[in-house]
UniProtKB/Swiss-Prot annotation:
Enzyme class: ligase
Organism placement in taxonomy: Bacteria, Pseudomonadati, Pseudomonadota, Gammaproteobacteria, Enterobacterales
Gene Ontology annotations for the cellular component aspect, listed alphabetically: cytosol
A GO biological-process term: threonyl-tRNA aminoacylation
SUPFAM superfamilies: Class II aaRS ABD-related, Class II aaRS and biotin synthetases, TGS-like, ThrRS/AlaRS common domain
EC number in record: 6.1.1.3
UniProt-listed HAMAP family: Thr_tRNA_synth
Stretch list, region Catalytic: 243-534
Name of this chain's protein: Threonine--tRNA ligase
Amino acid sequence: MPVITLPDGSQRHYDHAVSPLDVALDIGPGLAKACIAGRVNGELVDASDKIDTDAQLAIITAKDEAGLEIIRHSCAHLLGHAIKQLWPDTKMAIGPVIDNGFYYDVDIDRTLTQEDIELLEKRMHELADTDYDVIKKKVSWQEARDAFAARGETYKMAILDENISRDDRPGLYHHEEYIDMCRGPHVPNMRFCHHFKLQKTSGAYWRGDSKNKMLQRIYGTAWADKKQLASYLQRLEEAAKRDHRKIGKQLDLYHMQEEAPGMVFWHNDGWTIFRELEAFVRMKLKSYQYQEVKGPFMMDRVMWEKTGHWENYKEAMFTTSSENREYCIKPMNCPGHVQIFNQGLKSYRDLPLRMAEFGSCHRNEPSGSLHGLMRVRGFTQDDAHIFCTEEQVRDEVNSCIKMVYDMYSTFGFEKIVVKLSTRPEKRIGSDEMWDRAEADLAAALTENNIEFDYQPGEGAFYGPKIEFTLHDCLDRAWQCGTVQLDFSLPGRLNASYVGESNERQVPVMIHRAILGSMERFIGILTEEFAGFFPTWLAPVQVVIMNITDTQSDYVNELTRKLQEAGIRVKADLRNEKIGFKIREHTLRRVPYMLVCGDKEVEAGKVAVRTRRGKDLGSLDVSEVISKLQQEIRSRSLHQLEE
């Protein structure tokens, strides 16, 4: 009979099959009350599942990440329970866990309003407050299908027909009169599901296919306790204030419109930020000894067939035809860079060759996934490809890592999560090649004192990769940087160099992106700084204002001086009260406001005020220019006197 080994190494012997809940109760009533599920030999199981052989067991509670995920999954079932009570003819599709919550896709004969969502959430709370038990039953495939057929659940029947083997025994979870199907595990009792909030609805095609019916997707968040939920909702409220779409409109940075979905219309101030960011990256490229190149906007489909993109990626590619030839608008820059590498004979002495491009790329993203600057169809990659020998990989990766941290630190990002994705089951190349490649990436990270986690099997078929994920001031994760080894593409496109032994060899290619998409990174920065861009990035760095018309000439003279000093400055000579002007430019997040009255004109000075409302007093014009130039040149994140 089973011997259960607990995480601390202690063992418990039983003369009968036991469940995780039985073991938890054996340990103590407190643990039994907290038990959500179990992890048996590394696999999550329901609290009620029986263990009849020797096993390693960990009791899962709400304090565990897995426990919180189970709570969220069960809240999706709770949503299903509630919606079927309110609108019994609703057909349930899928209800998975997502970051911070869950959603459920439903087929309902009404457009859900905010009032409906509030009513649904109220019913969910009423049901959860009864603390009913969730009963799991394993049944035959046919029994499951019959159960859903009797309820008219056509989507559940389709899942059974298309995704579940006839030999399988699906798990049916009974929430009183409501039944849902899932692999599980789920909470044993609804007392764990009291802290949730329904958030929004959207449209979603069944199985993500636009040829299928559009369903309504209901999103929710769920947490282990009241405090966690309140904290998350507060972060959401702050995120809403920082929404780059809202700030972009307030600051007149860009717009988008229906005639060009997913394409950005940059306005002057937004384009100023873009160009400053581009200039910063270009400076770093020069420092790290990259060539800058420019590839064509589109190439013949034949090229994309050679690379494998047409076979694996064509749904995301825009195409056009001319003179009986089909062209693909590039979704990425790498094939073009290989073509540039292939021009002229290369020797091992020419390597490493570092090639960078601000590449204008297009991808046919689903319209429903488009989101401001964060998810677009037309974007600019700060892309680079390094062609090198196998022996040079480690040093080149090391240099890439230094460049990543060098650039991220400029923007104040301190929390960077790093993951190393290793060989997948289906891959090209020998085990020896993968051993060396993975070891080189790991060694480069270690040499830079960077902590990282392995993601086994998550590498591309053509090579391992490092991913860099930024965490912003709200602790949201943004995956931006990538260092990816590629043992496939150079060979596919006949790239070669002459080695030391005078034989042609295929170079290793390193794909390197740091900001990722320039558009997306500007969106991230807009939300990180809440529109209060550091002075070097701010579209307008200084506004000079007069109090009356008598100071107009002085303001114009100062404006010219600051322009000559390389400072982005505007004069505001409008016949408005100075308080009105200050408020307007404060709302526009202009870093510095210089006020000129008769006293300042007479003394040859300016009254300096920051957008945060700090009065820096009356300063000499030359001193202001010098300090501003230093702040801009150093790309400081802080303003004067901060």
